[in-house]
Amino acid sequence: ENIPVNEDAVEVVKKLTERYEVFIVSAATEFPNSLKEKLVWMETYFPFITWKHIVFCGHKHMIQADYLIDDHEKNLHTFTGTPLLFTAPHNLHITDFARVNNWKEVEKLLLD
């Protein structure tokens, strides 16, 4: 399956890696057959993120970081750092978190 990358994501994530230690975290273990596909996708679009900075886990509550950008509120409720809700059609009704609508907003918030 060829899932497109979000507009400006590659550029902004690359800039973030120049200032922060960035980890890509995916709850992909819920769907174990997707692990290899997700890793190949990551290597295709984000080759500058090494395997040491990719985390596949069952639940993101174990992640200890300063920021978590996620489109699922369930992952943000238990996060102890600053949660940022990335806008997606399934979360438009949620108002519990600071929201970023696109990667340019992430850039402005975390890099300006």
Descriptions of predicted regions:
Residues I3-V5, A9-K38, M42:
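Substrate-recognition element of Asp-dependent hydrolases with the DxDx(T/V) motif
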Residues E21-F23, Y67, L84:
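A structural signal for isolated positions on well-ordered beta-strands in alpha/beta enzyme cores
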Residues V22-I24, F31-L35, M62-Q64, N75-T78, ...:
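Short catalytic/ligand-binding loop motif for oxyanion handling, primarily in non-cytosolic enzymes
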Residues W51-T80:
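Conserved Lys-Pro-Asp/Glu-containing loop-to-beta segment of HAD-superfamily phosphomonoesterases
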Residues I69-K104:
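Acidic, Mg2+-coordinating phosphoryl-transfer loop and its flanking beta/alpha structural elements
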